[in-house]
Amino acid sequence: MKHIIHASGNVNGTARNNSDCPHVALPEEIFFIISITGVLENLIIILAVIKNKNLQFPMYFFICSLAISDMLGSLYKILESILIMFRNMGYFKPHGSFETTTDDIIDTMFILSLLGSIFSLLAIAVDRYITIFHALQYHSIVTMHRTIAVLSIIWTFCIGSGITMVLFSHHVPTVLTFTSLFPLMLVFILCLYVHMFLMARSHARNISTLPRGNMRGAITLTILLGVFIFCWAPFILHILLVTFCPNNPYCTCYISLFHVNGMLIMCNAVIDPFIYAFRSPELRSAFRRMISYSKCL
């Protein structure tokens, strides 16, 4: 969504005329380093699940899906930084056909990162709900075949939606659709949490007998969701302000923080793997085995 994702430069030009807020710029090198770190961390998560059979369960497949989403967000920024660098060196034209196509592909990756994160978190939330309240039927309800089918549907939808949003990014309905997915996801998970809370109160004794791992997974989801909201909400607000009030002095003050909001998104990809590792003993054991194996080579 080039006129939105990359709109800060144009908007900030008018912002200086309507607002006293200075544009907050961050060095591209910082974005690049954080993005590289995010790619490597999430790649380690994915490799750990692929190489360890004791991690090949639905919950970890959904975590892999979230890791792929985070990795796409980091790759987006890496490729964008490289494109900007070559453009500044004069190798690319500002509005050439190759540059425009490349820009569309990069923007699609960014949208895939957001959509993939949203639906992966939804899948994890539903998985945790079934784990807690249908523990005895969990393995018959959440099978590997169904997990793969759900993930295939999620990513097919995300790819189709991402391409569509980039093609029609200059239309306001597209922007509204893009931004509405974020609050809709929050409302759905909030309703799920309220239902889980009410069910927990009426089934307190049964829940207290559940394995600690089941509740640990629910707490991990809560932490992941909190980090996701904290890191993405400022950028979603940025998109709305750029679309509906780009010349308002108060809006332009917030829009001037574009780089800070972008930095938060990059940080999300770095923070999530630490949450997985800190909350999951199985992943920590897998990491130790991978490190021991690499030392033996």
From Swiss-Prot:
Topology in membrane: Multi-pass membrane protein
Residue ranges that the UniProt entry lists as topological domain Cytoplasmic: 50-58, 127-147, 200-217, 279-297
Residues bearing attached sugar chains per UniProt: 12, 17
GO terms, molecular function: corticotropin receptor activity
Pfam family, one: 7tm_1
Disulphide bonds in the chain: 21-253, 245-251
InterPro entries associated with the record: ACTH_rcpt, GPCR_Rhodpsn, GPCR_Rhodpsn_7TM, Melcrt_ACTH_rcpt
Top-rank taxon, per record: Eukaryota
Primary localization: membrane
GO biological process: adenylate cyclase-activating G protein-coupled receptor signaling pathway
Gene Ontology cellular component annotations, sorted alphabetically: plasma membrane
Localization terms from the record: Cell membrane
Transmembrane spans: 24-49, 59-79, 105-126, 148-168, 181-199, 218-244, 257-278
Post-translational modification: Ubiquitinated by MGRN1 that may be involved in post-endocytic trafficking and/or degradation of internalized receptor.
Lipidation sites (S-palmitoyl cysteine): 296
Sorted UniProt keywords: Cell membrane, Disulfide bond, G-protein coupled receptor, Glycoprotein, Lipoprotein, Membrane, Palmitate, Receptor, Transducer, Transmembrane, Transmembrane helix, Ubl conjugation
Family: Belongs to the G-protein coupled receptor 1 family.
Quaternary structure, from the entry: Homodimer. Interacts with corticotropin (ACTH). Interacts with MRAP; this interaction targets MC2R to the plasma membrane. Interacts with MRAP2; competing with MRAP for binding to MC2R and impairing the binding of corticotropin (ACTH).
Protein name per the record: Adrenocorticotropic hormone receptor
Native organism: Cavia porcellus (Guinea pig)
Organism taxonomic ancestry: Eukaryota, Metazoa, Chordata, Craniata, Vertebrata
